[in-house]
């Protein structure tokens, strides 16, 4: 399998069949899936998310409903098709809200698992109204997809972005506050991630939330800025797609810039000045035709 390429070129990785099987059983048990349930396979087979949907179907005896990966997966299923489980990326879910037919079919799915990228706040608010279970997942290729889940709607929903590890998964932090995962059933070694996190054990169980990637920390003039926090602060005020990125600077060491599809850079800079602290403000607004993304739909930030 290939890694997602979040921080560079996707890398080839060997996965053990026994560990893929263990991961599949963990998911099916967590979601209460049973033999005969229908699983929608709508993700590319080139990456772990698509492969694991097939493995889950084989291991847990689910009926596969396989369609060509596309941005509007709900257009490829019938109104009377009963889907018990579907895994999608945020873009597919967002696109499926665009018309009544797709929305109706999406709402009929019994378990929707969303992974591969952050879920926009506005999208999450809409998903909270869904009648069946919607989950946000945390994981990566090295853990053979997700090792933690967060309920978005219904009972036990968590709107504060806390994830709960699946049974058999241990969570700690390293000296840089990055998440360390000990999941021997799916990963042969302890995995040190690049995700800065907060771990909480005060509720009688372990939970964690992701602050951002350590790769996305901008050290500008002695001030450390987490790119994801800047994006979250700006998101409610900007309608056009945008991302923040960092580049080398002779003056500051590193500096933050914004890439945006918006036409009016002056207005965008005004919003940044009004909303952001002084040291969070981008040094330049770069207008692009389309925000650069990886093959798995994640922002491509290593551009400079």
Describe each PLM feature range.
Residues 170-198, 261:
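AMP-binding/adenylate-forming core of the ANL superfamily
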Residues 3-6, 39, 54, 86, ...:
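Conserved S/T- and glycine-rich ATP-binding loop of Class I adenylate-forming
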Residues 1-25, 32:
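Conserved AMP-binding A3 loop
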Residues 194-280:
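AMP-binding/adenylate-forming catalytic core of the ANL superfamily
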Residues 277-298:
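AMP-binding/adenylate-forming catalytic domain of the ANL superfamily
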Residues 99-156:
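Gly/Ser/Thr-rich phosphate-binding loop
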Residues 15-22, 38-95:
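AMP-binding/adenylate-forming
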Residues 6, 116, 139, 195, ...:
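Active-site glycine-centered loops adjacent to acidic/histidine catalytic or metal-binding residues
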């Amino acid at each position: 399998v290939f890694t997602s390429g979040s921080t560079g070129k996707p890398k080839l990785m060997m996965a053990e069949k026994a560990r893929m099987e263990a991961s599949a059983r963990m998911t099916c048990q967590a979601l209460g899936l049973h033999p005969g349930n229908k699983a929608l396979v709508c993700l590319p087979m080139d990456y772990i998310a698509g492969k694991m949907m097939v493995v889950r179907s084989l291991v847990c005896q689910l009926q596969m409903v396989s369609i060509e990966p596309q941005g509007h997966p709900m257009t490829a299923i019938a109104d009377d098709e009963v889907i018990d489980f579907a895994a999608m990326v945020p873009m597919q879910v967002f696109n499926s809200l665009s018309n009544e037919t797709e929305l109706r079919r999406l709402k009929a799915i019994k378990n929707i698992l969303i992974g591969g990228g952050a879920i926009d706040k506005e999208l999450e608010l809409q998903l909270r109204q869904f009648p069946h279970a919607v989950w946000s997942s945390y994981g990566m290729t090295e853990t053979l997809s997700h090792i933690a889940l967060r309920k978005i709607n219904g009972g036990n929903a968590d709107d504060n972005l806390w994830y709960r590890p699946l049974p058999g998964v241990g969570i700690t932090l390293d000296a840089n506050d990055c998440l360390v995962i000990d999941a021997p059933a799916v990963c042969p070694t302890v995995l040190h991630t690049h995700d800065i996190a907060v771990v909480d054990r005060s509720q009688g169980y372990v939970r964690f939330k992701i602050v951002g990637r350590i790769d996305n920390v901008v050290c500008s003039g002695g001030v450390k800025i987490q790119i994801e926090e800047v994006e979250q602060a700006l998101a409610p005020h900007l309608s056009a797609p945008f991302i923040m990125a960092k580049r080398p600077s002779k003056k500051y060491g590193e500096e933050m810039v914004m890439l945006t599809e918006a036409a009016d850079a002056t207005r965008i800079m005004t919003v940044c000045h009004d909303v952001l602290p002084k040291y969070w403000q981008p040094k330049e607004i770069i207008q692009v035709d389309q925000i650069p993304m990886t093959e798995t739909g994640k922002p491509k930030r290593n551009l400079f």
